[in-house]
Amino acid sequence: MPFACLAEASHCCTVALPGGEKAVLRRFFQRPKRSMAALLTRQRMDCKGDGRFLYASRPFQILRFEIRPEVLFAAQWSDQSQGLEIAFEDCWIHGLGAMQNAIRFECTALLVPKEECVEAQARAMVLLSSDSPLTALPTGLRQRLAAQALQLVFVRLERRCQGGLKRALLDWIAEDAMGRADLNRES
């Protein structure tokens, strides 16, 4: 069954990390499991090995639907893009009844360590099956609902970057600084 794009959007944010050296931040992101544990709720994440993870998102409301996304994604360090690449491999959107197989969600993200910050970029799409009963709804309404869903996703991503990821990175920076201070005392 062919799918058509209802909405596509991207979002960028910068996580300020005073004292964060690029090399130190890079070491953090070179271990995808550590990075994903900082970004996502650990109790909802299942590590599948080889940089693949299954994540059951917290439910959210759109209209009368309680939507519960579940995502299988891969995360890996890329020397070419100098960052952690995250790509959805599969996504299940529970809570839409018979319509849940008619909707697809795709997302890619890149977390790039810089001097004293991390730049996060995400691109996402909502797609609808051409034989879905939802095609009977006006196009404008379908597109607005899909755009609203993407904005909710980006709000969550921003909050996770500025919250858990930032805390984990600041702890990582502090641990690295203490380790270097201990080495200097021993010299």
Where do the PLM segments sit?
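A conserved amphipathic terminal alpha-helix motif
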Residues: 138-183
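Solvent-exposed residues in well-ordered beta-strands and their adjoining turns
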Residues: 14-18, 58-60, 76-78, 112-114, ...
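Generic short beta-strand segments
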Residues: 50-60, 87-93, 125-127
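Hydrophobic-ligand binding "helix-grip"
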Residues: 66-117
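Hydrophobic pocket/interface hotspot
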Residues: 24-26, 73, 122
